[in-house]
């Protein structure tokens, strides 16, 4: 799995003119799933994101997690994170998992975050979406499950 994590003051996702998810203070996740990903990858990613210390404490240091600050998460599926632009001018998306494989893993990650007590809003899987956010910092990170112990 590959997740772009953005700290946000506010965010919303719209599908066909209707807001389907919105948060205040928290994180926006752009989530990509590849063929080899499993629910174990989803659990790893959820735990990593829930405990990432990327919110400032009273001293202005990034020492607090989304859990610590009572933040929310807006999770948006994004297969284009596995786009390969090394050859030609059109990205190749062969590394992105097909929807029937990606959806259960994406949902498992969201559920694992909810189980930690985080309010999680989502976009609509597979839909064309408009994502609007106010970046806070900005703080933007990439988290990948291939980095967990034992993966190559």
UniProtKB/Swiss-Prot annotation:
Report which residue ranges the record marks as coiled coil.
none
Question: Biological process GO annotation list?
Answer: D-amino acid catabolic process
Keyword Cell wall biogenesis/degradation applies: no
The GO molecular function terms of this record are: D-tyrosyl-tRNA(Tyr) deacylase activity; Gly-tRNA(Ala) deacylase activity; Ser(Gly)-tRNA(Ala) hydrolase activity; tRNA binding
Quaternary structure and interacting proteins, as annotated: Homodimer.
Entries under HAMAP family matching the protein: Deacylase_Dtd (MF_00518)
Chain's role:
An aminoacyl-tRNA editing enzyme that deacylates mischarged D-aminoacyl-tRNAs. Also deacylates mischarged glycyl-tRNA(Ala), protecting cells against glycine mischarging by AlaRS. Acts via tRNA-based rather than protein-based catalysis; rejects L-amino acids rather than detecting D-amino acids in the active site. By recycling D-aminoacyl-tRNA to D-amino acids and free tRNA molecules, this enzyme counteracts the toxicity associated with the formation of D-aminoacyl-tRNA entities in vivo and helps enforce protein L-homochirality.
Official protein name in the record? D-aminoacyl-tRNA deacylase
Q: What is the lineage of its organism?
A: Bacteria, Bacillati, Bacillota, Bacilli, Bacillales
């Amino acid at each position: 799995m590959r997740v772009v994590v953005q700290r946000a003051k506010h965010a919303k996702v719209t599908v066909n003119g209707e807001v389907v998810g919105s948060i205040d203070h928290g994180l926006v996740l752009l989530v990509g799933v590849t063929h080899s990903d499993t629910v174990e990858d989803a659990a790893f990613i959820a735990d990593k994101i829930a405990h990432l210390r990327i919110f400032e404490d009273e001293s202005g240091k990034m020492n607090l997690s989304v859990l610590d600050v009572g933040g929310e998460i807006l999770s948006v599926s994004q297969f284009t994170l596995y786009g390969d632009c090394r050859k030609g001018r059109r990205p190749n998306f062969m590394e992105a998992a097909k929807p029937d494989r990606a959806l259960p893993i994406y949902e498992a990650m969201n559920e694992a975050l909810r189980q930690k007590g985080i309010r999680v809003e989502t976009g609509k899987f597979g839909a064309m979406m408009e994502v609007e956010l106010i970046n806070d910092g900005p703080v933007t990170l990439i988290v990948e499950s291939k980095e967990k112990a034992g993966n190559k």
